Amino acid sequence: MYEALKERFAEVFGTAPALLFSAPGRAELCGNHTDHQCGMILAASINLETVAAVRPVAEPRIRLLSEGYPMCEVDLQKLDPEEGEKESTTALIRGVAAGFAEKGVKPAGFDACVCSNVLAGSGLSSSAAFEILLGTIENHLTGAGLPAMELAKIGQMAENRYFGKPSGLLDQAASASGGVVYIDFAPGREPIAETIDINFEEYGYALVVIDSGADHAGLTDDYASIPKELHKVCGFFGKDVLREVDERLFYEKLPEVRAAAGDRAVLRAMHIYDENRRVHMARAALKCGDMETFLREVNGSGRSSQLLLQNIIPRKASDRQALSYALACAERLLEGEGGCRVHGGGFAGTIQAFVPLNRVDAFCAEMDRLLGAKSCHRLSIRPVGGVLLEVLE
């Protein structure tokens, strides 16, 4: 992949690249939709990556060619959001550059060719990997030295404000940090991040992500409904995020909250409270190598996402139940061993399974038969986040 990318850069720009950068996709391990409520998450950088061959330029502009897309060009003297760029690669480029400018760092111009083996629309966060890749490039070219969490915040801002998709900080933080990471997004302070040294295969399990075959196109309203409804719950108590609402008070006032915010909103709030506890338990389990407890929390997370959070079936297409089908097939094949859950934002994309090593080949073969060839992707943990891979000259 690297050599082909260098050759492509030379073809497009008429000169050789000077630098090679990489940023990983991510796997969410526990903490489904807790990030945008200032909750806790467990996630991991994975061995799938987005890579850029880069050459800095003196002009205040970025030209970027991403595999399978037309050339993007951004004038770094025009960094305000542009309505016509919503949901485009150009919007993310402009947004990340603007994020550096907002921190008092003049963004650097460069030419880049980008390719990726992070599956788009898969729940492995190809967009976050791209944002962290851009942030890593700018961080190096400008010498800004911003820490990983600041790059994550810039990526989140670019996705929310410029791309136009509501996003918590989980995806970007996991891609930027590297390894298995626990992050507490408690309001009023900087996020607390803790890296956990764990190799799932040493404990007898493979981490597998399964593509359900349904993509995320047209589902922005479904995603947006989750923070929107939770905001109704928070608003009842005069708060901005659920982390600020005392759980005991929430249950004391449950009939009134239900009347004000609606049934689904309170069910989703119940999920958030429970899910934060699951993250806490899963983190403690991983730190002491207790896979039984960890997998219990993984399965609990999956059940809660289905029953309470309700991010499995798209609202406008109830006949599209690819995630439910994939989860049912995985649970049947696991026969009570390991664990499985929805992976990422939900409604489409992928599910995640922890599969005993002695069953993983048969599991993947049967899931591929049931969902389509190459649906299963066996992943490994990548220990680093966004990084300069190579200086080429």
Predicted regions and their residues:
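Gly/Ser-rich oxyanion-binding loop with an adjacent helix/lid
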Residues: 1-40, 74-80, 85-202, 334, ...
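C-terminal nucleotide
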Residues: 1-26, 51-87, 182-341, 353-393
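Structural signature of FAD isoalloxazine-binding scaffolds in flavoprotein oxidoreductases
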Residues: 39-58, 177
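N-terminal pre-core extensions flanking Radical SAM catalytic domains
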Residues: 348-351
